[in-house]
Swiss-Prot record:
GO terms for molecular function: hormone activity. Keywords: Disulfide bond, Hormone, Secreted. Disulfide bonds join C4-C11, C59-C175, C192-C200. InterPro entries: 4_helix_cytokine-like_core (IPR009079), Somatotropin/Prolactin (IPR001400), Somatotropin_CS (IPR018116). CDD domains: prolactin_like. It comes from the Eukaryota. The gene is prl. Belongs to the somatotropin/prolactin family. This is Prolactin. One of its GO terms (biological process) is positive regulation of receptor signaling pathway via JAK-STAT. It is found in: Secreted. It comes from Protopterus aethiopicus.
Length: 200
């Protein structure tokens, strides 16, 4: 479901709390899809290969300082959390584009469910970025310092051996599952903090 059903020009007519509700639902949907996709890939391709031990702390977004749990996130000002959500989201533009283009070639026998989910996640992440940009524009009409970082170091080595290709896919899915959970959690906390009285 698009953040702004009648196009971006209609966003100014939607209450800010409603916009926030929409991005929270979209972020949760993305995390759910990503978790399903990772679990399917893990079960089908990664069993017995020891990928998880190699994937820990091997994400291209690891250089970003992010709160690890709700208690840590509570210590962040809401503007800092908004900036962080945008940094993490934008850092996934290139990796998701490559996943969409490379999965059919890199995993020729990949089931249609994985191919569909990769495309769906990439499309919905674009929608989420658009929704967050609308929210930031409403909350900070004069702009919010939000530099765009290029954290994606290089394309995956798609012509390497099968094990290396599979690990490259596994690692990306593992990392996006981790980051999509953080985005989902931070947005739920922000919604609660900004619009719900009585504490979070």
């Amino acid at each position: 479901l698009p953040i702004c059903a009648n196009g971006s020009t209609n966003c100014h007519q939607i209450p800010l709390d409603d916009l926030f509700e929409r991005v929270v639902k979209l972020a949760h949907r993305i995390h759910s899809l990503t978790s399903d996709m990772f679990n399917e890939f893990d079960e089908r391709y990664a069993q017995g290969r020891g990928f998880i031990s190699r994937a820990i702390n091997n994400c291209h977004t690891s250089s970003l300082t992010t709160p690890e749990d709700k208690e840590q996130a509570q210590k962040f000002h809401h503007d800092d959390l908004l900036r962080l959500v945008m940094k993490v989201l934008r850092s996934w533009n290139d990796p998701l584009l490559q996943l969409v283009s490379e999965v059919p070639q890199g995993i020729g026998e990949a089931p249609g469910t994985i191919l569909w989910k990769v495309t769906e996640v990439e499309d919905q992440t674009k929608q989420l970025i658009e929704g967050m940009e609308k929210i930031l524009g409403r909350m900070h009409p004069n702009g919010l310092d939000n530099e765009v970082l290029s954290l994606w170091p290089m394309p995956m080595a798609m012509h390497a051996g099968d094990g290396s290709k599979l690990f490259a896919f596994y690692n990306l899915l593992h990392c996006f599952r981790r980051d999509s959970f953080k985005i989902d959690s931070y947005l739920k906390l922000l919604r609660c903090r900004l619009f719900h009285e009585g504490g979070c």
